[in-house]
Amino acid sequence: PDITNFKLSHSEYFDAFVIGLTATPALHTTNIFGAPVFTYSYREAVIDGNLIDHEPPYQIKTKLNTEGIKWKKGERPKVYDPETNTIEELAELEDELKFDVESFNRAVITSPFNRTVIQELVKYIDPQSEEKTLIFAASDEHADTIVNLLFEEYEAIGVDVPQDAIKKITGKAYNPQELVRLYKNEKFPNIAVTVDLLTTGVNVPAITNLVIMRCTNSRILFEQMLGRAT
């Protein structure tokens, strides 16, 4: 059944006051509860001291993440297989194949792009600082790649990083809830790489840096991601 109709039928059947509270209002919210009777904006919360403001974003631009990827008819693209850690050449293309910026960020994960971004990040993020960093990846495999590259690039610039300082925290990680507990309460991990697990429902006041290495067209999801550090 349609979830909106399902919720409406329940709210109309029971004789009780219904109060809805949400930080990310969407169309289905007003369909169920009607127009909001009270709103408390992000800016008001910042002024009142309940939230903190964020600085302007630092954008790392490359040719790939601004122009996308385009292969011409007859070319043989090379792809990376994370399961075998090898690069394979595809069959000759019968038609032109183009990935726009959104598709690139979601599905086309290239080693040079990731390494370029990580090389820039390690200049600004101290893996032993009291300030914590949360990185949003496009997929679980992408998260693994980011973790490995972080260790490699810190080593390349002569920064010694404890093994527990950088962790992937996703649903596929071993004992993810314990990792969340450590991230919230202990010094390490200092840098966490996630996909969706830490998007909502987690409050880690020490998070100071948010790094978004994925694309989203969802305003609600973006606000939830931004809320991890505000």
Where do the model's predicted regions map?
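Conserved C-terminal RecA-like helicase domain
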Residues: 85-88, 96-194
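Conserved RecA-like P-loop NTPase helicase motor core
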Residues: 165-230
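Interdomain helical connector at the RecA1-RecA2 junction of SF1/SF2 helicase-like NTPases
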Residues: 30-130
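Short, conserved "post-DEAD/DEAH" coupling segment immediately C-terminal to helicase motif II
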Residues: 1-17, 27-28
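Short glycine-/polar-rich loops that comprise or flank the Walker A/P-loop
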Residues: 13-17, 35, 48-54, 130, ...
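Conserved nucleotide-binding/hydrolysis micro-motifs of P-loop NTPases
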Residues: 23-28, 60-65, 140-142, 173-174, ...
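Alpha-helical scaffold elements adjacent to nucleotide-binding pockets in ATP/GTP-utilizing enzyme cores
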Residues: 2-9, 32, 41, 45, ...
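Structural recognition of the conserved hydrophobic beta-strand(s) that form the central parallel beta-sheet
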Residues: 16-22, 192-193
